[in-house]
């Protein structure tokens, strides 16, 4: 037990330093190309912080543990929205740009609709469905690239106020992004692998590990990025990262794992005799995303009450999971 605990601590240190470098690089990239931080967060940062989910879910699906891949995607969305976004919103509520949020939010709910059809109507995730998810990922990236082309003109006036002398070189920006992403991925893997060993030693069921511990572990890059962004005053970067990561969890993470190894909806965890994901996790996933995004789209701001409500939902879900 000592070795897993030590590796767990090493992973945590990797995450902290990697998050610091990654946020610095992402913020510098946004300033260099005069792009909104929320947009950079929803694309570049989200890709980097979603790498652990991609790796964990792909390895799980290929090794025959579709339950882990399925639970990890849903659990990561819940964790991102009801824990990480909740912390960000509760600590620093504020204004957001609804226009920048529209594309990722629309793609998330479109992907969630496909996910619901597979889970409720089909009862399985087939390879053709995986191709559809990957196609949605490509469409999402194209939509964001088109949005980025419009962003510089809108941000030109603001960009003129930046101090050019303090601008980070492009080479250093890319080095910080890459090294930060690598440290985050390594740290997350160390935490997930060794944390899972510790949880298994304590007798925690695999389905519960997937929806809570593994989901939290693979969401640690988002958590580290969110906290680091808050400390550095880049809250838009944090929110964009969370929403973008949720889209990637449903279209990229699930798309890759389903394409490589199709699987049926797991039935090991039940609630009232019904698959718990159908009556609990998926409805909660949709609910927390609506609570997080709809007020922002309508009013252009996030309130502390939203963060508190989301944290309460996450705490209640964890309590239910560990008592099933």
Where are these regions (language model features)?
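Hydrophobic alpha-helical segments, chiefly the membrane-spanning helices
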Residues: 1-324
């Amino acid at each position: 037990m000592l070795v897993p605990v030590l590796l767990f601590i090493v992973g945590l240190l990797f995450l902290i330093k990697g998050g610091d470098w990654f946020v610095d690089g992402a913020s510098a990239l946004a300033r260099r190309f005069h792009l909104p931080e929320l947009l950079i967060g929803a694309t570049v940062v989200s890709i980097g912080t979603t790498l652990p989910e991609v790796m964990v879910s792909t390895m799980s699906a290929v090794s025959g543990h579709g339950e882990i891949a399925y639970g990890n995607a849903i659990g990561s969305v819940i964790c991102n929205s009801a824990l990480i976004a909740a912390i960000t919103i509760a600590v620093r509520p504020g204004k957001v740009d609804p226009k920048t949020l529209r594309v990722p939010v629309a793609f998330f709910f479109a992907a969630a609709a496909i996910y619901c059809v597979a889970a409720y109507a089909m009862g399985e995730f087939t390879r053709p469905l995986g191709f559809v998810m990957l196609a949605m990922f490509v469409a999402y990236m194209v939509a964001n690239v088109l949005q980025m082309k419009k962003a510089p003109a809108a941000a030109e006036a603001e960009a003129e106020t930046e101090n050019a002398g303090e601008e980070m070189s492009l080479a250093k920006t890319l080095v910080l992004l890459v090294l930060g992403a690598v440290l985050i991925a390594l740290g997350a893997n160390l935490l997930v692998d060794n944390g899972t060993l510790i949880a298994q030693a304590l007798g925690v069921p695999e389905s519960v590990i997937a929806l809570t511990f593994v989901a939290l572990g693979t969401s640690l890059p988002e958590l580290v990025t969110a906290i680091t962004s808050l400390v550095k005053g880049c809250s838009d970067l944090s929110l964009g990262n969370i929403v973008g990561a949720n889209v990637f969890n449903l279209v990229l993470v699930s798309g890759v794992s389903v394409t490589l190894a199709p699987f049926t909806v797991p039935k090991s965890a039940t609630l009232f005799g019904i698959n718990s994901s159908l009556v609990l996790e998926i409805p909660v996933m949709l609910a927390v995303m609506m609570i997080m995004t709809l007020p922002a789209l309508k009013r252009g701001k996030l309130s502390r009450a939203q963060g508190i409500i989301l944290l309460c939902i996450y705490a209640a879900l964890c309590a239910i999971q560990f008592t099933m």
